[in-house]
């Protein structure tokens, strides 16, 4: 949330021991993947183990001693106490066995669909949330580079373009363009070493 406190999404609740070295996560009921199969603790465990070996997420598991499932729950044991460990688990969960697919099976609000009209995101009728989705269908366009994306946006062939302040998409602002900030899972830290020159003075 706005205070960077973790919010339960796929788990209904979690518990930890007194010294915060062991966590038990209980999954939310009624959550299914895009193929209709139910989310299980085994799916979560498989995803986290794959994340543990990945370049992107491996650092988050540096303090993890072991992970296992028990009676439909996920148990994570740590090497050292960490009261903020749940905040590290904002990792997309996919169905075990589908992680190597071009489009792995997830539990999100939209389904990736390819039909006669091309690729699109279509509302997931079995999504577990009661949030009203803004669109039933979102058409997708594949582009080879940021210049092409900028051109398609400027010519109104594309109506939504995601860009960050460091991107090379250029200044796309105009009287007919609306800029909207949106939350991401990215956090940027700026650190200063005050123990060495020139900042040690």
Regions found by a protein language model. Give the residues of each.
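A structural "hinge/loop" feature
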Residues: 1, 7-12, 37, 83-94, ...
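N-terminal lobe/hinge region of extracytoplasmic solute-binding protein
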Residues: 1-18, 26, 49, 61, ...
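Aromatic- and charge-enriched surface segment that lines or borders ligand/interaction sites
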Residues: 12-56, 198-201
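Surface-exposed binding/hinge segments that line
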Residues: 15, 57-98
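Short, hydrophobic/aromatic-enriched beta-strand segments in well-ordered soluble domains
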Residues: 25-29, 72-82, 121-125
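Alpha-helical secondary-structure segments
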Residues: 40-47, 72-75, 135-137, 155, ...
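Gly/Pro-rich hinge or "lid" segments in bacterial periplasmic/extracellular proteins
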Residues: 81-139, 145-147
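Extracellular/periplasmic solute-recognition and catalytic clefts
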Residues: 113-120, 139-198
């Amino acid at each position: 949330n706005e205070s960077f406190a973790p919010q339960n999404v796929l788990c209904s609740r979690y518990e930890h021991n007194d010294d915060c070295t062991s966590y038990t996560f209980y999954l939310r009921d009624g959550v299914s993947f895009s193929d209709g199969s139910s989310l299980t603790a085994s799916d979560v465990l498989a995803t986290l183990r794959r994340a543990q070996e990945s370049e992107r997420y491996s650092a988050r598991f540096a303090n993890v001693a072991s992970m296992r499932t028990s009676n439909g729950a996920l148990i994570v044991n740590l090497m050292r106490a960490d009261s903020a460990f749940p905040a590290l688990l904002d990792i997309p969960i996919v169905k075990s066995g589908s992680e190597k697919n071009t489009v792995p099976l997830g539990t999100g609000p939209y389904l990736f669909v390819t039909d006669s009209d091309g690729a699109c995101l279509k509302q997931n009728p079995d999504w577990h949330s009661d949030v009203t989705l803004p669109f039933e269908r979102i058409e997708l366009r594949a582009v080879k580079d940021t210049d092409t994306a900028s051109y398609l946006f400027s010519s109104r062939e594309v109506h939504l373009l995601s860009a960050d302040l460091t991107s090379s998409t250029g200044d796309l602002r105009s009287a007919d363009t609306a800029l909207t900030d949106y939350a991401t899972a990215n956090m940027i830290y700026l650190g200063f070493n005050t123990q060495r020159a020139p900042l040690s003075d």
